[in-house]
């Protein structure tokens, strides 16, 4: 919203200066909210008349769109004259024209994002009842699993809730905003503050294409040195995954994916329980974090359920993001070395090549760390 405000101010300043000079009339007071509503109405019309508005849209298409934007619709020039945005563009020199086109394009793109947020905002409210029901059921299943004392008892819990688990996974994987909606149930800021919604949207929105790509990458990992554990949990996952629509529609080998996930789980458990280097890393991290996190503050907050935990994290997000970032960056080389040793020991390959953990982690950090 801040970026849109800056772009809007630039657009208004250039427009007012030129309109007042050309007509001799004085501009009215600016009402940004009023004008944004006009732009939100205009964007779908412009896309229908000219073309889709994308970051790569050509300059001449933007100029064409200017012909369909009349200033008399906006607060600062309401019903004053029939000038269109292109008439101001025509009066500018080449450098100013280039800047004006860029400003107008970026403003339309940001308005487009605002339209999307408004739509999601409406759906979040509409979907709350179903999501509350799903969330309660999920927590109930987790509670029963934690209370299970044997593998057979846990397997029975999963079997009894098989239909719900499959239908919920299908909902989650077919709706890129489903995770966001679940968080909204526990963090009311997503409903009341659109800027918070936009921030969370960037973090927790996952496209189907990204999911499919990630699943294929995991499925193609070669972890043949780790023995497959065909316990009842793995058998349940193997029975369930073929019923997931995302797997069906994208011809993903559910059995192969389940096998790799089982091996990864086995490997992680083994490292956490027997790898001395991993144990030392975790201990050092916890001890370091204790010096930066106020346990007393957490106790005073009175965290006693998922909702209060999510609210606490949300309210202190910036502080904890900084702590996590500092902890990770100070230990990145050590983490990479430990992971590469594990890869080397178990001969973990992708595309017939030994995984290079430094390349993988650094690439991920450079591409996606801005989200966190």
Swiss-Prot record:
The keyword Cytoplasm does not apply. Coiled coil: none annotated. It holds the Pfam family Pox_A6. Keywords: Host cytoplasm, Virion. The N-terminal domain is not required for crescent formation but is required for virion formation. Belongs to the orthopoxvirus OPG132 family. This is Virion morphogenesis protein OPG132. It comes from Vaccinia virus (strain Copenhagen) (VACV).
């Amino acid at each position: 919203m801040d970026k849109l405000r800056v772009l809007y101010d630039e657009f208004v300043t250039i427009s007012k200066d030129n309109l007042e000079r050309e007509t001799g009339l004085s501009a009215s007071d600016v009402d940004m909210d009023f004008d944004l509503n006009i732009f939100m109405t205009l964007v779908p019309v412009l896309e229908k008349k000219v073309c889709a508005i994308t970051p790569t849209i050509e300059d001449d298409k933007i100029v064409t769109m200017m012909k369909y934007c009349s200033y008399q619709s906006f607060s600062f020039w309401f019903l004053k004259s029939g000038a269109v945005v292109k008439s101001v563009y025509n009066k500018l020199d080449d450098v100013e024209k280039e800047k004006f086109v860029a400003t107008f394009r970026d403003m339309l793109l940001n308005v487009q994002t605002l339209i999307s947020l408004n739509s999601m905002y409406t759906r979040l409210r509409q979907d709350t009842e179903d999501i509350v029901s799903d969330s309660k059921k999920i927590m109930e299943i987790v509670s029963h699993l934690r209370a299970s004392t044997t593998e057979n008892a846990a397997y029975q819990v999963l079997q009894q809730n098989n239909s719900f688990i499959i239908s919920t996974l299908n909902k989650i994987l077919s709706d890129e905003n489903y995770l966001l909606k679940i968080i909204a149930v526990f963090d009311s800021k997503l409903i009341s503050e659109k800027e918070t919604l936009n921030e969370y949207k960037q973090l927790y929105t996952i496209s189907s294409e990204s999911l499919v790509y990630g699943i294929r990458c995991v499925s193609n990992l070669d972890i043949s040195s780790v023995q497959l554990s065909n316990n009842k949990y793995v058998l349940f996952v193997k029975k369930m995954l073929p019923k997931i629509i995302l797997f069906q529609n994208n011809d993903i080998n559910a059995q192969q994916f389940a096998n790799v996930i089982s091996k990864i789980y086995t490997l992680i458990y083994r490292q956490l329980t027997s790898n001395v280097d991993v144990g030392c890393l975790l201990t050092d991290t916890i001890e370091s974090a204790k010096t930066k996190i106020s346990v007393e503050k957490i106790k005073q907050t009175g965290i006693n359920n998922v909702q209060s935990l999510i609210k606490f994290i949300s309210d202190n997000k910036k502080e904890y993001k900084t702590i996590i970032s500092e902890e990770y960056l100070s230990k990145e080389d050590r983490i990479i070395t430990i992971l590469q040793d594990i890869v080397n020991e178990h001969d973990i390959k992708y595309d017939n090549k030994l995984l290079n953990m430094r390349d993988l982690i650094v690439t991920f950090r450079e591409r996606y760390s801005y989200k966190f």
